Amino acid sequence: MTIAYLDTSAAMKLVLDVPQSDALTAELTAREDRRLVSSWLLHTEMHCAAGRHPQDVDLDAVRAVLDSVNLIDLTRGDLLAAGTHAPLRSNDAIHLAVALRVGADEIVTYDGELVERARAAGLPVLSPGTASHQ
């Protein structure tokens, strides 16, 4: 079983029709042994995006994506570890800290800074539909 940590930049591509959406969907559905995980931060970020942009973000689509992801509780240790991932923005640092804590096999992200920090931490990155996709 491959554990794939899904960050918000990737999850939003599953609810919006953007250039990488089809490639991401194809990649995530290509392997039956891939288990999607994320922290509860994903829930917050996606619902906030839907609230801020209701004309663009369908709440039912958000719920469907969240239903397909195993959401993991944040710990104090995650927040402390996130502080060591400078210069990442706080939410990205939290996502990286949780991905590392749960032993994710890969992180699915389209955030350039998070891509760099994840690779530096030894975590393989998936960004289907981009030049940086491995």
Where are these regions (language model features)?
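Short, well-structured N-terminal submotif of metal-dependent ribonuclease cores
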Residues: 1-38, 52-60, 121-133
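Acidic, PIN/NYN-like endoribonuclease modules and their adjacent C-terminal/linker elements
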Residues: 2-3, 43, 68-72, 100-101, ...
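Short beta-strand scaffold positions
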Residues: 6, 37-38, 73, 90-93, ...
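Alpha-helix capping/helix-boundary segments
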Residues: 10-11, 42, 78, 95, ...
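Phosphate- and divalent-cation-binding pockets in alpha/beta enzyme and binding domains
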Residues: 23, 45, 81, 116-117
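Substrate-recognition element of Asp-dependent hydrolases with the DxDx(T/V) motif
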Residues: 37-42, 46
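Acidic catalytic patch
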Residues: 60-86
